[in-house]
Every structure is written in C-alpha cells, then in structure tokens.
C-alpha cells in the first residue's frame, strides 16, 4: 500500500495529525481487510501513541473517524457482516515496568473512590493473568449449547461471518459439554496456528510450488478468511477461549478465573499458562516468568494480558471509548521495527564465508538497540530487493541474530544504491570466489586471512591433522590476540619463555606443548594436506591425493583436469583445491612450513594410473579350475586391469569366470543372471573386448 504523502513535522500539529490518521488507516486496511500487513506492529503502535498524545494536547484535532476512536478495520467483501451483541474491544498497551505500576495504581485508586472508604488504602488488587496470542480474535455464539455462528472482530462493532470455516477447527466444540448450558453464550477467543503446524503447512506449500506464509499469524488469518471452507479444513488451525460477550440463561461467574475454569468444564479449549496474582509486583513476576519460557512455547505470543479478576470490580471500573479500564496488554519488546539502512558491508567468517551485513540507524527492537543486522548472502539481498538508503524492517527474536526482513519500497529514495559483492576479501585482499550451486561466497585467503586465522590454526592442530596435543582453542585465542601467531608456520617458532607467560599456562604445560610441536614436525603427506583446511578436502580425499601424486609439489601445480583424475575427486573439490593453491598467500605459508627444521614427511613416486579398460571398477568372481591359468595368475591379471576380485557372488557381481568343478558359485550366478565366462572369455575381457 503506497504511502506517498509527505511526512509533516511535529511543528505542524494539524497536518501531522492528518498524516498520522492516514498512515494508520492505510495500515488498518492492509492488516484487517487485505490480510497483507505492510507495517510492523511496533511502528503502528508508535504512530498510534503519537496520534493519541497529539489529540490529548490538541482536543480540537480529534475527528470521528480517527483510528483512536475505534478498534480496527472494516469488514471485508465476500463475507456477511455480523453485528456483535457486545462490542469486541481491543486493549490498551503497556511496555515498561512503569506502565504496569501506573496501571495498577489507576485501578486501585479508581476502586477506592467507588467504595465507602474513598481514597483509603486498600488490599492489593487481584488480577487474572493470561498470554497474549499472536493470532486472530473471533467470537463464537452458542445457543442452547450448540455452535451456531462465528464472527471476526472486524471494527469491534461489526465483523465477518466465518461460521463455516470455524466449523473446520477441530479444537472448537460444536456442542458444549454438560447438562446445564446457557441459552446464549458468546465466547471470545483467538484463532492461531502452532509453530509445528505452521512449519508443516509451509512444507506442503513448497511441495505444491505455492506461496509460503510469512509467519503463523498471517497463515491463521489467511486460512480463516478463505471463501472456500474446504481450504480452511486443510489448514491446521487452533483456538483458545479467553473472554465473554453475551451470557443469557445463567448467572455470570464472579471472577474471570472462574469464567475460564467454567469454559474448561464446557469443553472449550483454554490455555493453561494463566495465574491469579495480586498487585503490580505479582503482574511483573508473571510477565518475567512467561518471558523466560516464551521461545519454548509451541505457539507465538507477543505479550501477556492482565484483567481485574472480580467481575463486580470490572463493572465499577467500566470502559473508555476504545478499551476496558480493567484490563491491559503488557507487550514484549517489539520483535520487528523500522529503521534506515545506511550501508552494506561484508563480514568474513571463521571459515571464509562472506556475509553481507546491514549497517543501520540505531533502533530498539527485541529488547536491545540494534545497529547491525545480517543479510545472509548475496542471493537474499537480491531476492528481497534491499538497497542502501532503504527504510527496512528489522527483526530480532530472543537471542537470534538480528536480520533485515525486507524493505518498504514505497519509501525508497531516488538515490538508493544496489549492493555489489566485492571481488576481494576486505580483510586480506585475497580473491572472493563463489562456487557453482552454492549460496555463500568465500575468501580464498585460507591460511593467510586474519579473519580465518583461529579456525585455521585449530584445524591444523587437531588430532587427525598435525595432532598438536595441548594446543586448544583458548591457547590459540591468546596466541592470536597477542599477535604471537599469524599462520600455522609461526607455531613452530614459539619458545618456552613465550608460552610460559601465557595466562593460566604453567611451565609444565609450556614444556608439554613444546614437546608436542616437536613431535608434530614428523607427519605424513595426507595429514599435512588435511591440516591445511582446504574447503571440501576431508581425510579420505587427502589420503587419495597423497597416494595419487606421491608428493606435495605436483598437487600444488596440478591443473583441474589432473586433479579430476584422483579417485573420488569431483569438479567442486578440484576447483576448491585449484583455487587454494593458486593463492600466493597460501603457497607462502606452505613454503614456511616446509622450511628446514619445520614440518617433514616421507614422499614417494606417484601411483600408477588407474586402468581405464572395460574391467575398470568391475567386480569379478573366480570359481573352479581354469585350463591354463592358476587362480592367482588370473587374479593378478584382473586387478592389473582395474577389476576387483571378490570371493562370493552377489547382485553387485559383474562377471563370474568359471572353470571345471565350479560348484555353488556358478549356480548362484546363473540364478541371478550374472554373465558367466570361460578362460577364453576372460582373455577377451583382458584384451578390452566385451564378450
């Protein structure tokens, strides 16, 4: 939804109020009618509070259609309007502890004034505390215990009839339990989608190549407002009851907590994360406890709700135009907020991964001030169309690294600049490469790059590489931070006196590490190659390289085509090896490691090239006695041709060579349909002919 109107300054209250009303109404329309929210909740709350304050300071600016005078958006087309018998009001919000203390004081003072002891000190107020679900508010109507209608909140007075869709939600009873049910009951509650159900729904959307939902709230809202209830029936929606509209034929429970207990006895789903507390201290304690378990809950919440527990006290407190005086929503720090993206830098990870990072104007989100946020990778920046200068949505949930969710395209300045991935590492200057079919670009600096230094040293020292006992991560951290070690070659220059001065490093530990370094100087070529930490080169590949080439220099000088001749080395591994050894920095470090008095290993001649004939890689079984060849001679000839000689017949056998008195192996081959050859057939294979 475009917001093209220029933003007036606070010094023009008339124009500012009109602009705020316009922004909020557009957001309401996108949120409630289109189900396409384009403004983060925190930004909406900020604009709403500003308009409230402006209208308080300038009462003449209040208009009948101001968003402060009603709850939400109008009913959308396609559904029958439903007028609520009792309004579905929203709640006022609190954010800081001070807001909660002030709410409790207002309630206590108001209750005191309505008693005979006006103004006197009373006992702490009793409150019912619940979770604030991130879903869609609805009203369920039961007549004589039978479900007859469901309606969305809409604008609080008129909603939309979604009865047929709600019938598909299995947690909602179509008939209330018990013999004594009211003549009419309007149940207020929330339709939502559990996290696990949301994940499964998006899996199905991906499999069907359909658009995925952004979050569980959007999925729940979109599912509930489907014109075809068959689609809703396929969506895993849930419901929790938390309030009441109309009750006829039975007395109203005395307290809100008793209402929820009664709902449970009727078979209505009520959330168990609730409590009855006293005073502001009890409210804040409940909030903190819920906050600690928030991330582990199976559904999304954005705060908690406090309600004066006693029904008679609720009635005495009454309502303001938009919300009840007896209730408050205590919201968690916003998980999303708007700010300006001022630059995009790249960060080099411990394995050389290049990550674009957004530099932001400071914004408070998720309980902390955020100035940087991840953009993940180059493809994500392109997909989200994020540019320098954009107004962006930043998300921070719990301990998760802040990320840029997207940009508000209608606020994009004319000079917004696209991100360009650098070609050289900003830390070491080495070439940045991105392999085919990979989302992550990487610095090829390897051993030389300071950003990768600690990881490279740790890998070089681990047991399956140079096996430097006593060189753990904490020691490596100190060595790097004190600038004592820059590359693996520097490890072998360390002396006893230097090591003994390290924090928490006794003389015995220093001597043990010196001994380990001396021992590590004598290794194998395979261990050395593995210790270099070349991407995609594991122990097995390192052994294959050492066996194939025999020495290090031919590996370093090999072309991609020559590397592809090595057993189990494919295009990705060959490209990674070639890039690593093409970097002059890496070759320099290797030469330093091979200097006199440093690392040595035995070298040998390259292995004979593997046969490429028709028998290469085939499995052959010998059975019986051949006329002219002994079994050992036949085996040597087959292995020289690249075949593997097995001792038993299976589905993996390619040929069976059978002589006199072949026995059970021949029978098994015939049973499995495996080709059986005599000695002449064997010679044809050895000569490169397929029999």
From Swiss-Prot:
Instruction: Give the record's keywords alphabetically.
Output: DNA damage, DNA repair, DNA replication, Ligase, Magnesium, Manganese, Metal-binding, NAD, Zinc
An example of a Gene Ontology cellular component annotation for this protein is: cytosol
Q: What is its EC number?
A: 6.5.1.2
Which residues does the record give as Zn(2+) binding sites? 425, 428, 443, 449
Gene3D superfamilies the record matches: 5' to 3' exonuclease, C-terminal subdomain, 6.20.10.30, BRCT domain, DNA ligase/mRNA capping enzyme, Helix hairpin bin, Nucleic acid-binding proteins
Q: Which reaction does it catalyse?
A: NAD(+) + (deoxyribonucleotide)n-3'-hydroxyl + 5'-phospho-(deoxyribonucleotide)m = (deoxyribonucleotide)n+m + AMP + beta-nicotinamide D-nucleotide
**What region holds the BRCT domain?**
610-691
Q: Which residues form the active site?
A: 132 (n6-amp-lysine intermediate)
Record-linked CDD domains: BRCT_DNA_ligase_like (cd17748), LIGANc (cd00114)
Gene Ontology molecular function: any one: DNA binding
Residue positions annotated to bind NAD(+) are 41-45, 90-91, 130, 153, 190, 307, 331
**An example Gene Ontology biological process:** DNA repair
Kindly list the cofactors needed: Mg(2+); Mn(2+)
Provide the function of this protein: DNA ligase that catalyzes the formation of phosphodiester linkages between 5'-phosphoryl and 3'-hydroxyl groups in double-stranded DNA using NAD as a coenzyme and as the energy source for the reaction. It is essential for DNA replication and repair of damaged DNA.
- Please state which protein family the record places this protein in: Belongs to the NAD-dependent DNA ligase family. LigA subfamily.
- PANTHER family noted in UniProt: CHROMOSOME TRANSMISSION FIDELITY FACTOR 18 (PTHR23389), DNA LIGASE (PTHR23389:SF9)
Stated name of the protein:
DNA ligase
Question: Which source organism?
Answer: Burkholderia cenocepacia (strain HI2424)
